[in-house]
């Protein structure tokens, strides 16, 4: 394990995740010493862009290029809300989230979520204080979208949204937008779009990385990997 006492970087990253034991602090410091200048310039460009296009209603080539290069952390919550369409959904039903929290809950759904709370990012140093928010988001969404309800996998999506946005209601609307609009039918019972995308992904590996595909086939692990990812989202917590 590398000694971190001489590094100006913590052994925990900015999101609260512990860095790997073999994390190369020396190389990271060298990289960041120059990359911080890039991040500063990028933030200044985003500031100028947001002054011109506050609502991000104009999704042009420039905005797409900026997004691909990276959205500065402080701007991510609002930018995600606007470019995903979550902000517009929230505006149409501003009281929805609170009304869902004030409604009655099904015990089976609540119990499933409670089982998964301690399993969600247990090594994240910040997450203990966010578990109540995670529960609220998941229980509200499960009762809002009865077709999907609650299934394993949603806790990690919602958990990451909370970590990045630090906003419970924004995380709910982003979760709703992701599950229903951005990757629809990934978490439904038939998982139609997920199965389709996995098939496309497999075909891409075969065509573009045949050596990798042969290695996977030799290990006989592809089916296990795919089946594990496919069936995990809709398994009830045990």
Residue ranges and their predicted role:
Residues 98-137, 171-227:
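Alpha-helical cores of eukaryotic small-GTPase signaling modules
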